[in-house]
Amino acid sequence: YNLTGAIQKYGVQKQKGWHAINLFFNTSAGGQNTVLSDESFARPGDYVIMKALKNLTCGTSACPSDIDPCNSWNPTDIFVRTYDKNKEFTKSFAFRMKTDAEPKLTKNTGFYERTSKLTRNFVDARGYWLPNDYTKHGVINEYTACREKAVVIDLSALRKFEILGPDAEELMNYTLTRNVKKLSIGQVVYSSMCYDNGFMFDDGTLLKMSDHGFRWICGDEYAGEWLKEQAKKKNYKVRIKNSSDQISNISLQGPNSRKILEKFIWTPPTQPKISELQWFRFTICRIKELSGIPLLVSRTGYTGELGYEIWCHPSDAPKVWDVVMDAGKDEGLIPAGFGALDLLRIEAGLILFGNEFDGQVDPFEAGVGFTVPLKTKNEDFIGKDILIKRKENPQKKMVGLELAGKEKANHGDCVHIGRSQVGIITSGCISPTLNKNIALCRIDVGHSELDTEVEVGKIDGHQKRI
């Protein structure tokens, strides 16, 4: 009513009600279709930018709620600013590593100059814009190219940390579940990173760069702060540097990936050639010649196919992209986005933060128990005592499901035997290769045997089963 009266004089017709956009409230729908509210994600100074498609009329109406947590129990003013239509703004989300940290706006990667010419479908990947798919190809074609030929994927959103100093090995051996002391220079290992309670909050790959230098590549920017905290507690002589903005990386995956790399990679006599590079190893190299762009190439990936990852400085990224695409033009190489990557990793049974683990399950429950070598790693590491007990008394297990119907199972769907819930779907997809409906599921160990029949529940788990 207040809004109608305020803007009628501008020629806006009277209406019984107005559509509302929830900009700063933290609300959700409960299980019984009730609206729930909680502490707002917004902080003083946060803003939302909107573009008017027609003439814009602004009106304000007070809603000083101090009886619920939506305004943090303390109503504050909301200010509206208008800008000239020619004013340019970068499309961004605000990302906070911690609740009290300053917000960081979504960034472009070093490869954005090239990828933005091929697609407008970008997703925010923990503070970086990455392609979800490419206009000319689409998810299924990109997936197929990876299985049959080759694809290149921008994965620059991965966080990179340099761990340097005489106690670098001690720190990483203490904070990771894998036995870091077994690594040789040039070797890579995949590992879990756990809290004291044994719950897994991050995973990643560790590269041994030198006797006193390691590079931790992971998904969570908080991992760097956490490493600093542990180093301080143990009084380790080590420096931890965030190099995420100094290193861009693309993943070259597929049966033809080695052939493509061999066309332009130059390696010095002291480094392994691409043809010699073994699984979970890396080489220091250049493009074409000694004076070419410096690169690090690792034989790693996230697709289940033969693959490599190429690491370079962001300023060199556009040229690196051009060289890779040119080398792959006769090998069926196309760019691929996150949509295809998700299909590939689910088929391969590879885990994803927020799906298979979220800081509330241990590595055994997440399906990566092999990263916890309790029999061969004698040194102490964070979470070891709890993980020993949890391995002896497992409660959940990660399994693969084949669904009979055509409706895809989604993350969070409940899994039942009769009325009893026995598990939860962590990821699901229609597999193009298998031509089957498949899913990853964390299930009670008592129902994890092969060929056990279960039902996936939708809505409340009982009104609909698939």
Segments predicted by a language model, with ranges:
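Active-site nucleophile-adjacent alpha helix/oxyanion-hole segment immediately C-terminal to the catalytic cysteine
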Residues: Y1
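...with weaker cross-activation on analogous glycine-rich loops/strands in unrelated enzymes
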Residues: G5-D84
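A short catalytic or substrate-binding loop motif that flags glycine-/basic-rich loops and adjacent residues
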Residues: K16, P69-S72, D196-G198, Y302, ...
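Short, hydrophobic/aromatic-rich segments at coil-to-beta transitions
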Residues: A42-V48, G186-S191, K396-K397, S448-E453
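Extracellular structured ligand-interaction cores
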Residues: G45, W73-T76, L158, G213, ...
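Acidic, proline/glycine-enriched N-terminal capping motif
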Residues: N86-C194
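Conserved, structured C-terminal
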Residues: N86-V123, L130-Y134, L207-I466
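Internal amphipathic helical hairpin motif
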Residues: P166-D202, R258-I293
